[in-house]
Regions:
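Primary recognition of N-terminal secretory signal peptides and signal-anchoring hydrophobic helices
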Residues: 449-545
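Sequence/structural signature of beta-propeller domains
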Residues: 24-451
Length: 545
């Protein structure tokens, strides 16, 4: 097991809505997530001989705090997505072409794992499989065309054969635990919300038009609900991963994505608009929500990520305020969905307000996707990444040159590949994605207590550090003048003035060094002049022992 420690200060941040900026300094520890052999996914289809012992199950689609084990180690519930899947060619049957995905392990069952973090690393040693209401294990296979939640994809095996659909299939993402100990999960297909008991058996399911607002059916395929959390008062919140694509017309112009609130008792829903900064992304659809976590009834932590307009990847955590956000459930624009509205037409609508809290990449984060976020009872921020079970599609052409499988069309009748209408020989296998699965814990740095020293003592300390200065007090102008290169000699009680941990209010006096004012507060305590040591060091460059 491995862990790594990163530390940095937040120096710059941008604010997309008019809110105060919240800044903090954190230390991050990253733990590689190991999975017990018994929980790995059996697989032997790699031509290169990877994955001896099976695929490492990807418990990285969401995370929530569970508590502590008997040794005091923190534990978390983490959820998989639909299971191992990889890019595939477009699939043509009888002249109809569909998008497709390769499911090398079609029997995989989406699961909830228990992650234990120790000083040595993180490990998943137990898991709960998800089941339908009758207790049958579900799969992560897509839904058939025509059903709410269908992505239009064909599910294929390694030989490009169709392997069918699952009307109960789930692509699970967010996770939270309610007051009764039940799990709530969200799904990217539908989007769906599901409530399962502690054993993983389905209790309730919500879909667009069946417990959820119908407009959610316009999610971009495979971009349904990506984040879920439960507020302290019990409201279930779920975030759509990207902007809606209403009638296939709004994914390139919409200015916001939606956060849905469900009252699990009354079944009433509300929707809030989370703003997308169109100046940051070349397309609004490139902005993706990774997960959400409720700090209180109206404040969230939210992962926003995606490829920026300059081509770089971004993974950021925002603090989101819903207290003044307006319920947009019944709002339209010129008789159509609100997604059709240009930004200037939305100025009077109360969007969620957001402020940058953490830029993950400033701490050394390199994974493409941060997909889970929560907090511990100690206020630590926990983030988990999804490495897609550590697999990728490997494609080579007839000359043995690596190529991109998504550039090809596979014809189900002739069992041949083509590219740009020209038949080609292609070899397809599953390779290793070496991106590690990790869980990161961010702890806010504790501030060292302030130390206040008298100006006279500061002069003595400066001299010892090789920066001699003299002192002159001018009560007429309320100034203390320090002159570099001149030695200050103290006598008597001046030497005995001790550092203080606290002082009174700021005085009117000012500190002048070589004719220039030093912009730090000056205090008077028992007739002596004091300054904060750290502030003096920062302003002068001195290192005072």
């Amino acid at each position: 097991m491995k862990k790594r420690v990163f530390s940095t200060a937040l120096i710059s941040m941008f604010v997309l809505q008019s809110v105060p900026v919240f800044a903090a300094e954190y230390e991050a520890t990253a733990y590689d997530v190991e999975v017990a052999d018994a929980l790995k996914v059996p697989f032997s289809g790699s031509a290169e001989g990877y994955f001896e012992g099976g695929l490492v199950t990807g418990f990285g689609s969401a995370v929530t705090f569970r508590g502590y084990d008997a040794e005091g180690n923190p534990q978390f519930y983490a959820v998989t997505d639909r299971g191992p899947n990889a890019d595939a060619p477009r699939y043509d049957r009888n002249g109809t072409t569909n998008e497709a995905k390769i499911f090398p392990c079609p029997d995989f069952v989406p699961s909830i794992g228990v992650v234990t973090v120790t000083s040595e690393g993180a490990r998943v040693s137990e898991a709960i499989t998800l089941k339908d209401a009758q207790g049958n294990e579900i799969s992560g296979l897509p839904l058939e065309a025509g059903l709410i939640g269908s992505t239009g994809e064909k599910a294929l095996d390694m030989e490009m054969n169709e392997i069918g659909y699952d009307a109960d299939g789930l692509d699970t993402e967010g996770i939270a635990v309610d007051a009764d100990g039940n799990f709530w999960l969200c799904d990217e297909y539908g989007p769906f919300l599901v409530k399962v008991d502690a054993d993983g058996t389905l209790l309730e399911k919500y879909a667009p038009g069946d417990g959820l607002p119908e407009i959610l059916q316009y999610r971009i395929p495979n971009r349904g609900f990506e984040g879920l959390t439960i507020t302290p008062s019990g409201t279930v919140l779920a975030s759509v991963q990207s902007v809606l694509d209403v009638n296939g017309e709004t994914q390139k112009t919409a200015c916001f994505t939606r956060i849905v609130a469900l009252d699990p008792v009354t079944k009433e829903t509300k929707m809030y608009a989370y703003p997308v900064d169109l100046s940051q992304y070349s397309s609004p659809a490139n902005c993706k929500i990774g997960d959400i976590y409720a700090i209180d009834d109206h404040t969230l932590l939210l992962i926003e990520q995606g490829k920026l307009a300059d081509g770089t990847m971004s993974n950021r955590i925002y603090r989101v305020d819903l207290s003044t956000a307006e319920d947009i459930s019944n709002l339209t624009y010129e008789g159509s969905a609100l997604e059709y509205a240009p930004a200037e037409a939305l100025q009077d609508i109360g969007f969620a307000q957001k402020e940058l809290l953490l830029d993950l990449r400033a701490y050394g984060w390199t994974a493409e996707k941060a997909e889970g976020i929560c907090m511990t009872d100690k206020g630590e921020i926990v983030v988990i990444n999804d490495n897609d079970f550590g697999i990728v599609t490997v494609t080579t052409d007839a000359n043995g040159v690596d190529t991109d499988i998504t550039d090809y069309v596979y014809n189900a009748e002739t069992k041949t590949f083509s590219k740009d209408g020209v038949a080609e020989q292609v070899s397809v296998s599953i390779g290793e994605n070496t991106e590690p699965a990790q869980i990161w814990i961010f702890r806010e740095k504790t501030q060292e207590p302030a130390v206040y020293i008298s100006v006279r003592q500061a002069a003595l300390m400066a001299a010892e550090a090789g920066n001699p200065v003299s002192i002159a007090f001018d009560s007429a102008s309320d100034t203390v003048h320090l002159t570099s290169g001149e030695t200050y000699a103290a006598t008597g009680t001046q030497v005995e003035q001790q550092p203080l941990a606290s002082v009174g209010s700021v005085s009117a006096w000012r500190l002048i060094l070589d004719g220039n004012e030093v912009d730090i507060p000056v205090y008077h305590v028992n007739g002596y002049t004091y300054v904060e040591q750290a502030e003096l060091e920062a302003a002068t460059g001195w290192k005072l022992a």
